[in-house]
């Protein structure tokens, strides 16, 4: 339960027992949250992904830069580079994304006929040698005419200059495609990568210790990444700064050398006018939160709530102010005389719009926020005097509830992106950015698709796998008509629409026979859906239940190599079907 109590915390500067509505920031909803485009014109998965996020100009940029690099550096020694086409680039990324669903020991096994890992959809898309050629020459930034000394100078200013344009391009796409809800959060994500690079971070407490750090502003309700940029390491410029041909930063240098590291990234992510003065609630963790960050965000009309480290707030960064705030509160600690009892809380007002709250749960929780807090109750697991587990009710500040609700957007978005991260191994660090952010665009399109169609959590279409798999297969078979008068870069979808999964046992002859008797090259592959409930096999003479599906027909069909079960073959065989009529 989470009921608000009538009595307020003893916070300086406000009346006792004031209602919550008087102090919670009221969100000024100037525009509707969610996707910004007209749903009636663009609401299908294909249109959302390729019309909003992965647009044609992105693929053209990849093709032009990769061809420029390949012509200069991938020719010679008896090898001739053949220009990469628009179709090949999309098919290449389709194979890369497909390897997020299927992991193999060595990717060449996908092309080896007779190998258990052989995958027709990949083998028919392009040859293994052509895939390796594109992988070897893949580039976003064309720096073939940039002298090596200028490249080294650029790397000293920003070590990620080769991919910053790509990251900024997709960040602008996401920014233009989504309006935030009333709550947002700023947190750090990561791109797993083990390489020799100055921007690579190491944190042994993370699931993947070595990674590139990404700072992101996410919607807390729908987990959509509104804005993001990559961290290039200490002393590097932030993305968006102007760097001339000599590698010099043209932006005016900040004279204040005492600016916190987190301050720069929060300032950069919130520098859009559409986020200002709408009482947006921003959640920050203790690495970002601080007095200077809160004052900067309040000057932009953004409310803040977050945890913080207690030894930061006491220190003053100005000679005019005292070293410590007067009547500074005593924080709860894990042990000693200041250890609290579960449910104890204190709140204190440091400035006009700067409050701190200390609450003791199993351990002390210290919050810094820009609006007053009140008192609520929350249920927690506890033990009674006999040692039995019970549900106990404790008091809790409302800012803790707000913080828990708001600080989850970036973490959930990172979790979505990690589900089907590609298994393509490469020694080149820019490729990690390319593959990671293309995967993230699939997640963004999936979030928009769920929002437009109002899909609930357990709806069968509200699955990232079910949303992404047909799109990836379409990319692997992508073709364009060069004989027509239309733009050769306009995609032509030759993939037959996927039929919905059958509910229960149905006769085989009621299925879509035009799709059913297509050759196997059209995508009639058997896959195992471990998360789906077992359904009755659609073969006429079989009554077993199975989790195996046909990728094109979408119907359950059992297949067992040990017992020589032929339901999958019989269902797709026109001759066998005719014998049964």
How would you name each of these model-derived features?
Residues 1-581:
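Acidic, contiguous segments within the catalytic cores of piggyBac-derived transposases
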